[in-house]
């Protein structure tokens, strides 16, 4: 499916809310997001290397889906469970609407590496290095203009979300490949927790 939009999220979770956070994410948050027209897939990852604890991204038809009436209605009317999680569980939130370009169009893997940057693309991300690392799939993400509005959910978190300018996603079959790639390009390695698709 040729989806052109990404909602990319990196975050930590307060340890005392971890169990509640996981139940909420799996039984309410992912299904609710995937109910919005234009959302096709949500994937959750857990950190293998230092950095944020969690990484989640959603594939959408195009970035405009993330300013649609249906999506904004959800953001502005959080459920009681969402209010609690946003206010007390989430921290160090980095949330960005992106356009995406698929560089290597292979199957999704069970492990991944992300690297975000501002300005020029890091030299280490040259085609030769990427090929040497052997990813199954590679995508580049670029922030769009759909990142300016402060939603009710963001207000609950009590601090403005961080934003990326650009990021790369490399997907691998095995953990050792992801760890090697993260060490080589200075990124963070992840293992897949869950996928929900339409």
Task: List the predicted regions and their residue ranges.
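Macromolecular interaction modules
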Residues: 1-198
């Amino acid at each position: 499916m040729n989806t052109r939009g990404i909602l990319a999220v990196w975050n930590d979770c307060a340890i005392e809310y971890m169990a509640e956070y996981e139940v909420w994410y799996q039984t309410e948050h992912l299904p609710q997001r995937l109910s919005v027209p234009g959302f096709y897939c949500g994937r959750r990852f857990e950190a293998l290397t230092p950095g944020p604890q969690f990484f989640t991204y959603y594939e959408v038809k195009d970035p405009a889906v993330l300013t649609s009436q249906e999506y904004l209605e959800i953001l502005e009317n959080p459920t009681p469970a969402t209010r609690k999680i946003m206010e007390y569980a989430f921290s160090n939130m980095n949330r960005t609407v992106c356009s995406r370009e698929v560089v290597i169009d292979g199957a999704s893997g069970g492990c991944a590496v992300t690297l975000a940057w501002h300005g020029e693309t890091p030299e280490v991300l040259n085609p030769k290095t990427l090929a040497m690392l052997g990813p199954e799939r590679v995508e580049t993400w670029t922030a769009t203009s759909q990142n300016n509005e402060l939603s009710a959910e963001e207000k609950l978190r009590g601090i403005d979300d961080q934003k990326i300018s650009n990021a790369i996603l490399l997907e691998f079959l095995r953990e050792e490949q992801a760890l090697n790639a993260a060490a080589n390009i200075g990124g963070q390695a992840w293992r897949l927790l869950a996928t929900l698709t339409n």
